[in-house]
């Protein structure tokens, strides 16, 4: 979705714009049915990145407003149920954020994050080793507990290098195709970076 959005925002022909718009809609349908809440949330930084670096911000704003307005109408029932399920407590172990109770899956994820931060101090430099701690659903927390501060620093450095190089291509290229691809990759990277908070993305 991010890549075809990048192409849509950089192409100059109406025919190609319609093609990329159609592809974006086509890709969005199965994306919604993944029922992945972390992936849905990652759309926000993806769109924000497109707005930040694209020269066609007005078009994006119109599409965002339209999408938000149509979402309650067009979203399938199963997706709405997935969202409402997030805030329904199912046991005494469900966590509360303020006055909002979370479902068991979200609660277990947050509890595991807290345990990671608590146990991290026992092996802060090199961590517990790959698979040495147990399953953790969250890339950054998993990297921190398994590879320690050194592994975390290396991960952030790699992510920074990827983003920097793709941004360089976008800013310096005069070819619309490469600029569109780079813009889409920037947005995709932002989405994956955000997705990594709540899932093992990489």
Question: What residue spans do the PLM features occupy?
Answer:
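Alpha-helical transmembrane segments of multi-pass inner-membrane proteins
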Residues: 1-54, 64-67, 161-171, 177, ...
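TM-adjacent membrane-interface loops and short helices in multi-pass inner/ER membrane proteins
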Residues: 84-143, 147-157
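Membrane-interface catalytic loops of GT-C/OST-like multi-pass glycosylation enzymes that act
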Residues: 34-39, 135-137, 198-202
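Loop-to-transmembrane-helix entry motif
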Residues: 55, 147-151, 197
